[in-house]
Amino acid sequence: MEKLTVRTGTQDTDSEWDHFLEQIPDGRFEQCSGWAAAKMEQGWRCSRIEILRSSRIIGGFQILFRNKGPIRIGYISKGPAIDAKSPGLLRILIKQIKDQAATNRITALLVHPTENGHSVYAALRENGFLPNKLYSVIEATLFLDTSGSQTDVLNRMSRKTRQKIRQSIKRGVKIREGRDSDLSTFFQLMQDTCK
């Protein structure tokens, strides 16, 4: 079995980490270095942990933290990020989360995995984390059934949503079906919104 390496970073830009996030299904912009840079301008600090195998990132997370009165709060939004081809990594990441919380003297830590993070939630509970219904900084994930014709899709939306779509089209917004080749552009757009 190959040895894993843990790398700690605090820099506000990390193109290697951002590239890793682009390559995995659950990579989210809230974990990208651009998001950390935007939050650092608002007084947050960042600690990024990357787990490497053969000099290649296979998982990690980014903790943002700051002082709030007498305590230090931290959060991991839409993380940890894990390469699906790396089973067993979750246990290592949770240990690193606890270590980083202690190292950075974080009193209260919110870990908010991705929507597909059911195994992460279970592993966190097994390791002493308590469930809480706190919301992340951005709660804007939407799942939309796009099966059927465009008319079918629109008919499943509320009247007000359909009205806003028509207004947007009148203002020049173009709607088209995306392709796999558009994903990198979409991810870049999400990163640019963090700047």
Task: For every predicted segment, state its role.
Residues 1-195:
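N-acyltransferase acceptor-side catalytic subdomain
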